[in-house]
Amino acid sequence: MEDGGVRRWVVDISKWNPSEDEFCSYLSVLPPHEHPTITRFIKCEDRKRALVSRLLQYSLVHEVFGIPFERIIINRTIEGKPYLQNTKSLAFPNFNFSASHHGDYVGIASEPVCLVGLDIISNSIPTQETALEFINNFSSYFTALEWKNITEAENSDEALAAFYRCWSLKEAFVKALGTGLGYGLQRLEFRHTNWTDISVYIDGEESRDWRFSLFEINDRHWASIAQGHPKTAVQSFRSTLLKADFEGEHHLDPFLLPDAGGFILQSVDQLVAVSKQEKLGRLAS
């Protein structure tokens, strides 16, 4: 279900293998200034992920606000948080979105009021080291409790899954906050009951300003969603929001808004269809 400015979309790129001409055709749907952010990648898979990520952003904004692709202006804060520049909507005062990719999937999530962060993970097994050796490289980013839960899992597969899920929650939080790579992930401690009823402790104190969800895309891919009160955004990102303080306005409480539930699977052709139809309409007129 989708409501208002809330969206949850994913694209499976594993079977999408466009020819060079087809790739250029899809790329042409986007404004020219976006092209270098995609073509700078050398590997084909990286280019595919970059292109689909941008297509998701533009297609989502177009669906929510009806803005033609060529008139959509997406800027970034100094920390790298993307935001929509050219709309101010009282219905969606803090419209924001977060894109992510890993493995076979590229996804996007949006919210009209509260902050949103998305992180997709592929539960892939490292090829040159064991799962436990791989996990140990990141021990400094977890609290003692988190590390205990990871390393005391029943087997290495379970340990790897616990590691990825916890890591993904941390990444989703940071992306929602808009802080960029400078935020110390070890400051965050996630507590949960079998990965439900997830709460976050920041510097040892539980925060009531956040809500978290984990979604299983398939047996190898998961998505983490972080939803935060807009007052928690870093200043550069907060300055792009219309409404950060909701005290005394319960009808605007971001956590009373309906959840979007699971993700809707989109195809690349679905993402570009509207833009192509608009171009054909202009040519015909």
Cite the ranges covered by each PLM segment.
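Core catalytic alpha/beta fold that binds nucleotide/phospho-ligands
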Residues: 1-285
